[in-house]
């Protein structure tokens, strides 16, 4: 006899035999692993009470044979993921109350399904549940299975114990019989149907009345099995056929009339019956899945609410996106890491002046100084411009300017929001100034490094109460490098003063020399060291000017 084993199988058998395992042990192990034909649920007619009466009352008794030795559980291949002990399912105990013929038929059908492929049976049960809109929760309540394990078994074919599969198949067989009985049930009269539907609605709303309607014998039976969970009512679930009809009707009319809703009820029930493979005249057999006019009304009301909520969400998202875009634009403009461009000076992306003449000079300087908080290093753009070329009707910067000036006292608004520079229109067209965009503290640091005294006329863009004002001239007339002079960078306790104290401090300055518009250009002895400058700064930096002594007078004009 030619062996049908492969070389690998022969090696495995040889290794088992050489390890000391006898033939009898191998045969016994094979019998335990392989399912026997007597697997499943078997029925026997045993007397209910052997010691009472001569005529025994026979009822079906179920024995779940898990293996040849009737052990309590199977091997690891049939084990569940949760690993909990699973006693006799409640549904098997309830099956004892059925008639003998029905119980025998159900047991035979369950035994047949247990002998087949579990994955094939799982797909069949899943399709039946989808066809009749049966939720998995109903199966869990009846069989006591774990819902996660049941879902994995139906969807992915996860192995399940034979005892659990027997409970699942028993539910499936009983559900088929129950649904078939519902559709084959005949109604005596329309009045009886109305009374039954009214009673069902009352029990649907008040399930506690169903317990009161039970007889004393049924109550005793219910109390004798406290382990059974209380059955919850099945929640109505729209089928795919009905949803397709309702969505098409919603596209035509969002708020149908009562007559239109009743027509939709008939159409939906007809579609549900066709989905289940029964005649539309047996729509009463749908049970909890029966479509009513109230359910259609609620469906349309819910769709209208969802549509309105979706519109509001879209509006809020659009508003939020606009706000975020504006904030990102502002942050990108206020970024201190501005990359200089290699384009001509009149096309700088950061700063652009409308000017005439060929005296354009573009350079970059780095100003470093130490303050009370940190070192400030700023990149400045210097341009030799003619103030007369700045039209009073135009802003200092073009609207598309992107350069922002950040100072130690906090970020400033975009420079493009400056007011009209109307004070420059009185200057001499031949006058030229260097415009330095840097904090005032940086200008003071430069001033301390000079070796000569000189009078300066610095137009200052003042920031009062958090907003930018127009150019304000500041005149310096002091010895900038005296040994006894205190550092100008020292911050006073009242540096963050309000607008009113600031104006009062300015008006109290002695020997103030207000800026007068002269037609002749000013003469400086050291123009290459510290030329006139325009300082873009905030209130916290300008307030340091008020702490200067009488030899360091800085009259300001603010409005």
UniProtKB/Swiss-Prot annotation:
What ranges does the record list as Polar residues composition bias? 353-371
Q: Which residues lie within the region annotated Dimerization? A: 1-31
Q: Just give the chief location class.
A: nucleus
Question: Where's the POU-specific atypical domain?
Answer: 93-188
Classification via CDD domains:
homeodomain
Q: Which residues are in the HNF-p1 domain?
A: 1-32
| Molecular function, one GO term | protein homodimerization activity
Which superkingdom, per the lineage? Answer: Eukaryota
Phosphoserine modifications at: 49, 52, 75, 80
The protein's location, in the record's own words, is: Nucleus
Q: Which GO terms describe its cellular component?
A: nucleus
Q: Which InterPro entries match?
A: HD (IPR001356), HNF-1 (IPR039066), HNF-1_N (IPR006899), HNF-1_POU (IPR044869), HNF1_dimer_N_dom_sf (IPR023219), HNF1b_C (IPR006897), HNF_P1 (IPR044866), Homeodomain-like_sf (IPR009057)
Keywords assigned by UniProt? Answer: Activator, DNA-binding, Homeobox, Nucleus, Phosphoprotein, Transcription, Transcription regulation
Which residues fall in a compositionally biased region of kind Low complexity? 328-341
What are the boundaries of the region Disordered?
A: 328-371
Reported function: Transcription factor that binds to the inverted palindrome 5'-GTTAATNATTAAC-3'. Binds to the FPC element in the cAMP regulatory unit of the PLAU gene. Transcriptional activity is increased by coactivator PCBD1.
Q: Which family does it belong to?
A: Belongs to the HNF1 homeobox family.
Q: What is this protein called?
A: Hepatocyte nuclear factor 1-beta
Source species, please?
Answer: Sus scrofa (Pig)
Q: State which gene encodes it.
A: HNF1B
């Amino acid at each position: 006899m030619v062996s049908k084993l492969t070389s690998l199988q022969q090696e495995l058998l040889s290794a088992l035999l050489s390890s000391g395992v006898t033939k009898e042990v191998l045969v016994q192990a094979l019998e335990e692993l392989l399912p026997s034909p007597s697997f499943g649920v078997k029925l026997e007619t045993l007397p209910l009470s052997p010691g009472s009466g001569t005529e025994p009352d026979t009822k079906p008794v179920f024995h779940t044979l898990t293996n040849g030795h009737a052990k309590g559980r199977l091997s690891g291949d049939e084990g569940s993921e949760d690993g909990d002990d699973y006693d006799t399912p409640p549904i098997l105990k309830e099956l004892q109350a059925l008639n003998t013929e029905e119980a025998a038929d159900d047991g035979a059908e369950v035994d047949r399904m247990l002998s087949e492929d579990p994955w094939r049976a799982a797909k069949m049960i899943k399709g039946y549940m989808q066809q009749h809109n049966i939720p998995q929760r109903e199966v869990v309540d009846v069989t006591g299975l774990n819902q996660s394990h049941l879902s994995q078994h139906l969807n992915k074919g996860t192995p399940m114990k034979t005892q659990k599969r027997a409970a699942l198949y028993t539910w499936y067989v009983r559900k088929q019989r129950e649904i078939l009985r519902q559709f084959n049930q005949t109604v005596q009269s329309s009045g009886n149907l109305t009374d039954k539907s009214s009673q069902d609605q009352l029990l649907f709303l008040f399930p506690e009345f169903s317990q009161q309607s039970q007889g004393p014998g049924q109550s005793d039976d219910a109390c004798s099995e406290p382990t059974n969970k209380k059955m919850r009512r099945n929640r109505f679930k729209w089928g795919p056929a009905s949803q397709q009809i309702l969505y098409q009707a919603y596209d035509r009319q969002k708020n149908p009339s009562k007559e239109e809703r009743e027509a939709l009820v008939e159409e939906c029930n007809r579609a549900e019956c066709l989905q289940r493979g029964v005649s539309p005249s047996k729509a009463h057999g749908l049970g909890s899945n029966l479509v009513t006019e109230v359910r259609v009304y609620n469906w349309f009301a819910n769709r209208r609410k969802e549509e309105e909520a979706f519109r509001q969400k879209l509006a809020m998202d659009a508003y939020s996106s606009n706000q975020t875009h504006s904030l990102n634009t502002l942050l990108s403009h206020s970024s201190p890491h501005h990359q200089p461009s290699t384009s001509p000076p009149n096309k700088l992306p950061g700063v652009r002046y409308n000017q005439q003449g060929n005296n354009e000079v573009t350079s970059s300087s780095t100003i470093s100084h130490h303050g009370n908080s940190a070192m400030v290093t700023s990149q400045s753009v210097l341009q030799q411009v003619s103030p007369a070329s700045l039209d009073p009707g135009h802003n200092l910067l073009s609207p598309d300017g992107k350069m922002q000036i950040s100072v130690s006292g906090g970020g400033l608004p975009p420079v493009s929001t400056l007011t009209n520079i109307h004070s420059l229109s009185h200057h001499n067209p031949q006058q030229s100034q260097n415009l330095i965009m840097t904090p005032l503290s940086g200008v003071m640091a430069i001033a301390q490094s000079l070796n000569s005294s000189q009078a300066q006329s610095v137009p200052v863009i003042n920031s009062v109460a958090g907003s930018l004002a127009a150019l304000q001239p500041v005149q310096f007339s002091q010895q900038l490098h005296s040994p006894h002079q205190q550092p100008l960078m020292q911050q006073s306790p009242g540096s963050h003063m309000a607008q009113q104290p600031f104006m009062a401090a300015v008006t109290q300055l002695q020997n103030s020399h207000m800026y007068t518009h002269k037609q002749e250009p000013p003469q400086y002895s050291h123009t290459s060291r510290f030329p006139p400058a325009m300082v873009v700064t905030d209130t916290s930096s300008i307030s340091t000017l008020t702490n200067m002594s009488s030899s360091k007078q800085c009259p300001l004009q603010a409005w």
